[in-house]
Curated annotation (Swiss-Prot):
Protein name: Cytochrome b6
Native organism: Mastigocladus laminosus (Fischerella sp.)
Functional note: Component of the cytochrome b6-f complex, which mediates electron transfer between photosystem II (PSII) and photosystem I (PSI), cyclic electron flow around PSI, and state transitions.
Keyword GTP-binding attributed: no
Cofactor note: Binds 2 heme b groups non-covalently with two histidine residues as axial ligands. Binds one heme group covalently by a single cysteine link with no axial amino acid ligand. This heme was named heme ci.
GO cellular-component term (any): plasma membrane-derived thylakoid membrane
Length: 215
């Protein structure tokens, strides 16, 4: 093992990286509530793993979506557990995200020079809610269908561009296959890439600026 370590150390200076990670100063006022962001990240990683597992069996069509979800729940080995963990961690992720936002706000973590960290966090919150909206529709049951119907119809109240936005969300003038395809694409491809990018920016800024001081 020593030879392997020396080989990597010579080329990548991994000890310097390890020292930088493990020797970061943590202010004495930090408590358990400062872990809410990390818990949110953990929930997302669980979401990613369980969601990826379900893509092997889920069929994003209006005629097969519901049946494929039932197949996952009843026929796939541990499918019920994987989907249940996905749902539970989704709820936990939203809850932890909300508590994290409140903690940052109440402790003044949004103030100068951390404005950009706060903005990236707000964007991450919007993306998290978008995950919930798009994922809720994927079983394409009565609850999911009418949820999409309501959500996609809300923008119609916006003057001038409202109808255009609704048609963009639905993939047409009515809810159907195009809608499910768009929500599935957003849930499994667009939103994961967006949240990965903004998480990276968020963590890099936290790493650079450190944890904010007490009020």
């Amino acid at each position: 093992m020593a030879n392997v370590y020396d080989w990597f150390q010579e080329r990548l200076e991994i000890q310097a990286l390890a020292d930088d990670v493990t020797s970061k100063y943590v202010p004495p006022h930090v408590n358990i509530f400062y872990c809410l962001g990390g818990i949110t990240l953990t929930c997302f990683l669980i979401q990613f793993a369980t969601g990826f597992a379900m893509t092997f069996y889920y069929k994003p069509t209006v005629t097969e979506a519901y049946a494929s979800v039932q197949y996952i729940m009843n026929e796939v080995s541990f499918g019920w557990l994987i989907r249940s963990i996905h749902r539970w961690s989704a709820s936990m992720m939203v809850l932890m995200m909300i508590l994290h936002v409140f903690r940052v706000y109440l402790t003044g973590g949004f103030k100068k020079p951390r404005e950009l960290t706060w903005i990236s966090g707000v964007i991450l919150a919007v993306i998290t809610v978008s995950f919930g909206v798009t994922g809720y529709s994927l079983p394409w049951d009565q609850v999911g269908y009418w949820a999409v119907k309501i959500v996609s119809g809300v923008p119609e109240a916006i003057p001038v561009v409202g109808v255009l936005i609704s048609d963009l969300l639905r993939g047409g003038s009515s809810v159907g296959q195009a809608t499910l395809t768009r929500y599935y694409s957003a849930h499994t491809f667009v939103l994961p890439w967006l949240i990965a990018v903004f998480m990276l920016l968020h963590f890099l800024m936290i790493r650079k600026q450190g944890i904010s001081g007490p009020l």
